[in-house]
Amino acid sequence: MAVFLDFKRQLKLWLEHIVHHVSDLQEETILFISFGPKDHRCSVWHSEKTVLSQATLQLFDFIDDQFSPDQLPDYIKIDVAYNLEKQSWNQIEQQVHHQFHNNHYRRGIGFDESCSVAFLEQEIYGKAIIRGLSYDKPNFFDEINLNYAIKQKYRATKPEIKLQSLQEVWTFDTYATFYENGQFINLASRYDANGIRAIASNKKQHFRGLIEKNAAFLHSQIQENGKFIYGYFPAYDRDIRNYNTVRHCTSLYALLETFEVQDKSEYWPKIVAAIQYALTTFYKEKDPITAFMIDGKEGELEIKLGANAAAILMLTKYQEITGKDDYLKYAEKLAHGILELVDPDGLTTHVLNYANYDLKEKFRIIYYDGEAALALLRLYQINQDK
């Protein structure tokens, strides 16, 4: 009960603090609360669009009704809407249509004047209301996903939304705070950093915590056979079925780098399994002194300059930390592979077809060149082979 009462006290103070910094909160706003356990997608409730004092009463009534005084949810986030703005639906569609990626729209959207149907930015992407099928096709609002999200979110029946019939919507920014370890942590508002927590005052401790937590996550994603759980789409928590050699190796390299900060002996069995998985699955020798890392689906296999570089960075970092040269011969053959992709003038070739080694793409990604140079330098530090 004491924790519950302290939570409400702090929330009241935070709302009082916010109102002094946002002039338009004296007018209409919407309060959102996102909450849930660690192993489940959060639920999101919001007040009516009304004055802050009335919205605050509605929020606290909801908290008293839904939360147990003896046990708060694991995750709680509060959003306060401001800059509520009526915009033409066509204007919003065009903004989304012309964005380079499908997750760059940073505002919440209400789909009627009273905002009885409203979604935060994070809900819009978490429920795939805005989608992009591929990098070269325009982004769009998915009507089926929107209406499915409405049915999931609201207890009361809402009319189905037909996007072609929409004339206007109400967009908004939010100020937000995240409740963790008995305190409220302010989150950034607007633009690229929207919804991201500010850096703690002790930056060294903050960054160390980030490194340790991300290392633990990477380690947890390595399966027994050494293959990573590649990732999840945030909408519907679906597994990403693709796999990528460069990301396998760079993820391992990143995990190995964390040993500069912390020595986790319990990580080694999975790290070794993941290195072995890379060498067994992707490593192919062209001749006795030259090797390449392959990538892609069966029938579309290719050789990437960046994949060889990433593998060398992974293997040399392992040797640097452990002092063991178990994988040195693999790194040296991969280095010969890189040299085959660099002409006498220093110009690189980025992608070959496998297994005929003919040109697929002269240039693909700008960082391949720097990655390859760094990999060769890291190997030179170990074997001094000019």
Regions from the language model: what does each represent?
Residues 48-209:
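Extended, non-transmembrane interaction/recognition domains
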Residues 42-79, 255-258, 262-276, 281:
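Post-signal peptide N-terminal segment of secreted/secretory-pathway proteins
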Residues 186-238, 260:
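Eukaryote-specific, low-hydrophobicity, charge-rich regions
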Residues 2-47:
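Charged, amphipathic alpha-helical stretches
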Residues 227-244, 287-310, 348-371:
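Carbohydrate-binding/catalytic loop surfaces
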Residues 155-162, 209-227, 268-289, 328-349, ...:
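Long, well-ordered core segments of solenoidal/helical folds
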Residues 189-204, 249-265, 310-324, 371-385:
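Well-ordered alpha-helical scaffold segments within catalytic/enzyme domains
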Residues 313-385:
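Active-site lining segments of carbohydrate-active enzymes
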